[in-house]
Amino acid sequence: MKKYKYQLIALFGSALMFTGCGNQNGESSSNSALASNNAEKVYVAPGEQDEFYAFMSGGYSGNLTVYGLPSGRMFKEIPVFSQFATSGYGYSEETKPMLNTSFGFVPWDDSHHPDISQSKGELDGRWIFINGNNTPRIARISLTTFETEEIIEIPNSAGNHSSSFITENTEYVVAGTRFSVPVPQRDMPINEYKANFKGALSFISVDPEHGHMDIKFQLMMPGFNYDLSHPGRDKSHGWFFFTTYNTEEANSLLEVNASQNDKDFIAAVNWKVIEEYVNNGGGELMPANYAHNVYDESTHTATSTMKKEVLTVDPLKVPGAVYFLPTPKSPHGCDVDPTGQYIIGNGKLSADLTVHSFDRMIEAIEGKKFDGEAYGIPILKFEDVLAGTVKSGGLGPLHTEFDGKGNAYTTFFISSEVVKWKLGTWEVIDRKPTFYSVGHLMIPGGNSRKPFGKYVVAMNKITKDRYLPTGPELEHSAQLYDITGDKMELIYDFPTHGEPHYAAGIPAELLAPKSKKIYRLDENKHPYAVTSPDGAKVVREGNEVHIYMSMIRSHFTPDNIEGVKVGDKVYFHITNHEQDFDVPHGFAMIGQNTSELLIMPGQTKSSVWEPKKPGVWPFYCTDFCSALHQEMQGYVRVSPADSNIELSWSLGD
């Protein structure tokens, strides 16, 4: 115990040393000519556009942010798991169901790992998936509208962390549990964790045409912690690889008790074999309760359905389904190179990188070269699956991606650096400092069969002195490196929103041409849509008042409404009649306890207002739309609850 504590002190002392001397790494000595050259590399002239999109998780923002590369400009924050007052997501009646769960309405999550859909192992740019870590969920976002279209909750899971990574044809998106839990959940002593908790690895099928998700099966694994994962690709397609830690199954003081074993495992899962087993009737249906939320673009409305069962699979009932690859303790990243041959385990407490060989793994399986078993799952002999070791000289390896030219790039958290090394020879080619304490990195397409090896983005956990101070809380630092030459070159710093845990990049030419510009008004199937100003009306249904309203530069129809009473529940159903690109309108009502609405051309959204006292109360457009934007306003007259004022509405009277 004491020895381990001393090791920790030494490691963190090293971290402070590396961080403290970061500015002495030669960056400040760059001459003006070099600085000018770097500026040219990242400069995007007015009217021109970036070469790549970069999608970064927001971490505790619960959302996904969109940047351009090389400029580092932030274009959009896509609301996913968190309410977002800027657009009304999670506040409007249409989007509230997106945040429904078995725990009720949950308006926040911890978003972690975006992954872009693929075909034949290459990015196709249809959707991007991201996981909610806290309340286990997977979201699918359209890369045509840049809006969240679907969220599915994951039962039997907790700390949905080894997610949301996809197979190379987007057959499945996986959701692995970080925290093993009792399955089914029940009251039991925490200290009886060992051998009683389970780790669920969920394989969620994705409809190839519409993208709709459904839990195909859950693989019930031993009660380890499942950290990160990546699919096999090319020759290893059909397999999925998950890093594990806490194979000790400790339930307290994990920084010590979950680091007793010299090695943990990478779990190699043959999902093709399990899929065949399930398709032939295998598996056991288990009662469950989880939400499946889907947004319909034609009605502009989300629905939430509670599902009541899930198919579970015992790996011991499927021969050849799972094998354990010993990997130095507490591996974080589990990264597969573009050929599918090499599986890299980044042991956080190791200075070296362990590279497993897929071919050697198959040979070891066929030759039954086992070194015992864990809960009936064979453990392959370490030396029989090892391809090589990268003697990096760094501290705290976390995550590796690839440039498509035979090179790999790994982040080292403690020594604050990115290390470039050669696949096959394992030699270190280059290393560059980061500022500071880098977590993950991203090369566009760097976790696919076709990387676009021009840039690497390092996502740092510590910012310190990189930007002007903004009080105790700082945005996280990201750094852009040019990797087109033999040596990496740091060319730009830019701040990122929330805490990016992971990112995915794609060439702009694959997305920009198909980006949606408007919603066609004649295709609007919202039940409360007003497709013509003549359809505007106000209807009372008991104590509910429904206002069917249209908006166009620069007025609402109607803009004067009377007959509303204290205690009514007033629904504004508002359709934007614009059909020009980039002409949204906003709506806000004084005293409403939700948020404003931001309504795109051709779209309908609804907001609820519950007036508490009599008066004449204004509403207005929140989004500047024309020279007469200020004139885009109206009034609602609210009368006492016992009044008999008739409903009336008008425009221009």
Would you name each region that the model predicts?
Residues 17-20:
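C-terminal motif of bacterial Sec signal peptides marking the signal peptidase cleavage site
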Residues 40-43, 85-92, 107-120, 156-166, ...:
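Repeated scaffold domains used in trafficking and secretory/extracellular systems
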Residues 78-81, 110, 152-156, 216-224, ...:
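Surface loop/turn motifs at the tips and blade-to-blade linkers of beta-strand repeat domains
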Residues 53-56, 127-130, 172-174, 239-242, ...:
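Conserved beta-propeller blade signature
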Residues 600-653:
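Extracellular/periplasmic metallocenter environments
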Residues 40-52, 113-116, 125, 175-197, ...:
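Short, conserved, GDST-rich strand-edge loop motifs in beta-rich repeat architectures
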Residues 69-74, 143-147, 203-213, 268-293, ...:
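Short loop/turn segments immediately following beta-strands, especially the blade-tip
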Residues 539-569:
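N-terminal edge beta-strand
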